[in-house]
């Protein structure tokens, strides 16, 4: 499946980032990987993947963000901002902590977790680079419309 998805993302010049699985990322020559706190350490992934691949990391605290950056992460996913159905065991991250992380690291920070068009306003003036959204798009009757609405809403508050 990852090979098929990668062919599609390449068609539109969009990087494919594989969540958690460095082996799958390598097998399909994906542009990068995103690593959670319980996945392979960022510094080891960087040694394996090299400097040209994108490595994202999850951070819930400023110390985790600083460590990920020091170990070679290119970007951070911070959250969950709200409860989410995609991660059963997750700890919520406050918007204040999100802002502190943005100020602490010089790499893009993206908010994640339970975000949708009705609650994304909470991220205004946080300095984040973007948002990561799954359920609000995948569970929508019209996923394309849902994605467009979230994109427009985020652009308005950024």
What function would you assign to each model-found segment?
Residues 28-30, 35, 57-99, 103, ...:
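Glycine/Thr-rich beta-alpha phosphate-binding loop at enzyme active sites
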Residues 1-18, 37, 42-61, 89-117, ...:
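Alpha-helix-loop-beta-strand connector modules within alpha/beta enzyme cores
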Residues 1-4, 25-26, 78-80:
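A generic short-segment signal for beta-strand/edge and adjacent turn/coil regions
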Residues 16-31, 45, 60-72, 104-111, ...:
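Catalytic cores of alpha/beta
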Residues 37-44, 77-89, 120, 124-153:
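Glycine-rich phosphate-binding active-site loops on the catalytic face of alpha/beta enzymes
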């Amino acid at each position: 499946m990852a090979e098929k998805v990668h062919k599609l993302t390449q068609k539109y010049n969009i990087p494919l980032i594989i969540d958690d699985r460095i082996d799958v990322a390598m097998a399909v020559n994906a542009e990068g990987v995103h690593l959670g706190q319980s996945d392979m350490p960022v510094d080891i992934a960087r040694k394996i993947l090299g400097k040209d691949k994108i490595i994202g990391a999850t951070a819930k605290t400023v110390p985790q963000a600083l460590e990920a950056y020091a170990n070679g992460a290119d970007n951070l996913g911070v959250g969950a901002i709200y409860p989410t159905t995609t991660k059963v065991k997750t700890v919520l991250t406050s918007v204040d902590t999100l802002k502190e992380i943005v100020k602490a690291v010089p790499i893009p920070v993206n908010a994640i977790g339970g975000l949708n068009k009705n609650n994304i306003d909470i991220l205004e003036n946080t300095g984040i680079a973007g948002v990561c959204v799954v359920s609000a798009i995948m569970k929508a009757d019209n996923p394309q419309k849902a994605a467009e609405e979230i994109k427009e809403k985020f652009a308005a508050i950024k």
